[in-house]
Regions:
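Conserved glycine-rich cofactor-binding loop
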Residues: 11-12
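Alpha-helical segment proximal to the catalytic Tyr-Lys
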Residues: 112, 156-160, 217
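Residue(s) in the substrate-gating loop at a strand-loop-helix junction
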Residues: 127
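Short C-terminal tail/terminal secondary-structure segment
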Residues: 132, 209, 220-234
């Protein structure tokens, strides 16, 4: 059964892999992007998740073109790393606004239609860093940890309306965001991963597709780590 899916930040990296995976399963997938054209084979809508009006306009466009949004993957996010003592306040608040408050804006708008339909799938892309912490990433880690609390609160609040809310927590993924690591940092990273390799983006995408599927209808408030074991115990 084809569903209408919105993937925020779905024009590159993990988000693009998720969008392609869901489209391959027959869903009508719309990706948000901030500029340019959407990836080939996918529907696109311009949206900045830090702007409530833009989020509302994006949903209105999708609803008018494709129908009510049934599945949302809150993937859009940024990094602005820096040591705690040197991090300017706007580097902290900016990352929180995009990664955490942005997901809240999307969730609030998405659940209007989901509550009427008494069905919805909300999937938040967090990070192992949100569970373990990381030096130089206090802003990013806080934003990704916040998604867990958000998902579990939504799960409790809206579960009676047939809406599930779950989190996928990727570890180190082989994308352009990790391509700039130094050889030394990459060696350290590999040594910390029990499976001894980074993930491929499509491995994250398949986990998301499972949580979006009917097979996961009785799963809500869960955190699914896809991290090669690096975050085990958290």
């Amino acid at each position: 059964m084809s569903r209408v899916v919105l993937v925020t930040g779905g024009n590159r990296g993990i988000g693009l892999a998720i969008a392609k995976e869901l489209a391959s399963r027959g869903d009508t997938v719309v990706v948000t992007h901030r500029s340019g054209e959407p990836p080939e084979g996918l529907h696109g809508v311009i949206c900045d998740v830090t702007d409530s009006a833009a989020v509302d306009a994006a949903f209105s466009h999708v609803e008018s073109e494709h129908g009510p949004v049934e599945v949302v993957v809150a993937n859009a996010g940024i990094t602005q790393d820096g040591l705690l003592m040197r991090m300017p306040e706007d580097a902290f608040t900016g990352v929180l606004d995009a990664n955490l408050t942005g997901a809240w804006r999307v969730t609030q708008r998405a659940t209007r239609g989901m509550m009427k339909a008494r069905f919805g799938r909300l999937i938040y892309i967090s990070s192992v860093v949100g569970l373990t912490g990381a030096p130089g990433q206090v802003n990013y880690a806080a934003s990704k940890a916040g998604l867990v609390g958000m998902a579990r609160s939504v799960a409790r609040e809206l579960g009676g309306r047939g809406i599930t809310a779950n989190v996928v927590a990727p570890g180190y993924v082989d994308t352009d965001m990790t391509a700039d690591l130094t050889d030394k940092r990459r060696e350290e990273m590999m040594a910390a991963i029990p499976l001894g390799r980074t993930a491929q983006a499509d491995e994250i995408a398949k986990a998301v597709a499972f949580l979006a599927s009917d097979d996961a209808a009785y799963i809500t408030g869960a955190v699914l780590p896809v991290d090669g074991g690096v975050g085990m115990g958290h």
